[in-house]
Swiss-Prot record:
Site positions per UniProt: Cleavage: 98-99
GO MF annotation terms: cytokine activity; growth factor activity; heparin binding; identical protein binding
A Pfam family hit: TGFb_propeptide
Domain of life: Eukaryota
Gene: MSTN
Membrane-crossing residue ranges in chain numbering: none
Protein's name according to its UniProt entry: Growth/differentiation factor 8
SUPFAM superfamilies named among the record's database cross-references: Cystine-knot cytokines (SSF57501)
Subunit composition and interactions: Homodimer; disulfide-linked. Interacts with WFIKKN2, leading to inhibit its activity. Interacts with FSTL3.
Length: 375
């Protein structure tokens, strides 16, 4: 009994010397550790976001087969951009980003962008295009985007200046050919007739698919065309060489080519917002702003939701392949572990100038992260 009392006295003495225990200190330390963990997660996500933006810039140039971003200023874009109905419809109405994630899928498509529409502007005329010492409009050069795809539709768009009184307009589209023995330099393509009323000018489209297909088969036969739109008094109403106040009224070709459908496979994933404390693999929002890059050569969209993946990957969590966990169990030291990566991506539609100042409307694959997983 006496021995027990001695032990109790010693214990009380130790408590007095050590002083009171501050339980709040442990909770404060725990809170600091949690805050530090959250801070590290935020920093990691910010670094991942920055890397994703840089990767997107590189991917876009690579997928569009551009070595560098086209050097086209905002003012130049305003001058080159046709004020024509088909282009305005693309800018105002087309779906800049597909939201119809029909099947969760990782696109099984080619790496490069798929062209759907090309707006070809007239190129500068050369000596072959000059008749009687005068340049004629118009001569069009065609990129590989048209040459190696099936042409579905080809429309020549011309702008007719306004008239003061009702009149009938005779449109002539003439194809320039090599001089024949009798001196003939032209052959007719189309000669539509239309009625115009006083008011604003109008855009008129003419089907030139057959002519374009012939040019693609025999490029040497492409010497250009001449455009005329004569009213009843013989005045030419067609804008071929725009004057003051006629920017964006140049003739142009609208060419539509085929697009190949892609196969898909299913997958699943989880989403989080930027304020989430979740440390596991998730998809986070990311908006890419092309104007912030100074990429004025991209006509539309000016920005799009790209998203990115970030987070830790525990084994058997959102794994893309079921055998990943088995491989790690068989050889835990030889496996680096799964990584948080996109498992479903979708394309975006883009309207842009290429290096030849042609306007392209096409689809760029795998630019939007729809789902994330561990693989």
């Amino acid at each position: 009994m006496q021995r027990l009392q001695i032990c109790v006295y010693i214990y009380l003495f130790v408590l007095i010397v050590a002083g009171p225990v501050d339980l709040s200190e442990n909770s404060e330390q725990k809170e600091n550790v949690e805050k530090e963990g959250l801070c590290n997660a935020c920093t990691w996500r910010q670094n991942t976001k920055s890397s994703r933006i840089e990767a997107i810039k590189i991917q876009i140039l690579s997928k569009l087969r551009l070595e560098t971003a086209p050097n086209i200023s905002r003012d130049a874009v305003r001058q080159l951009l046709p004020r024509a109905p088909p282009l305005r419809e693309l800018i105002d109405q087309y779906d800049v980003q597909r939201d119809d994630s029909s099947d969760g899928s990782l696109e099984d498509d080619d790496y490069h962008a798929t062209t759907e529409t090309v707006i070809a502007m007239p190129a500068e005329t050369d000596l072959l295009m000059q008749v009687e010492g005068k340049p004629k409009c118009c001569f069009f050069k065609f990129s590989s985007k048209i040459q190696y795809n099936k042409v579905v539709k080809a429309q020549l768009w011309i702008y007719l200046r306004p008239v003061k009184t009702p009149t009938t307009v005779f449109v002539q589209i003439l194809r320039l050919i090599k001089p024949m023995k009798d001196g003939t330099r032209y052959t007719g393509i189309r000669s539509p007739k239309l009625d115009m009323n006083p008011g604003t000018g109008i855009w008129q489209s003419i089907d030139v698919k057959t002519v374009l297909q012939n040019w693609l088969k025999q490029p040497e036969s492409n010497l250009g065309i001449e455009i005329k739109a004569l009213d009843e008094n013989g005045h030419d109403l067609a804008v071929t060489f725009p004057g003051p106040g006629e920017d964006g009224l140049n003739p142009f070709l609208e060419v539509k080519v085929t697009d190949t459908p892609k196969r898909s496979r299913r997958d699943f994933g989880l989403d989080c917002d930027e304020h989430s404390t979740e440390s596991r693999c998730r998809r986070y929002p990311l908006t890419v702003d092309f104007e912030a890059f100074g990429w004025d050569w991209i006509i539309a969209p000016k920005r799009y939701k790209a998203n990115y993946c970030s987070g830790e990957c525990e084994f058997v969590f959102l794994q893309k392949y079921p055998h990943t966990h088995l491989v790690h169990q068989a050889n835990p030291r030889g496996s680096a572990g799964p990584c948080c990566t996109p498992t479903k991506m979708s394309p975006i539609n883009m309207l842009y100038f290429n290096g030849k100042e042609q306007i392209i409307y096409g689809k760029i694959p795998a630019m939007v992260v729809d789902r994330c997983g561990c693989s």
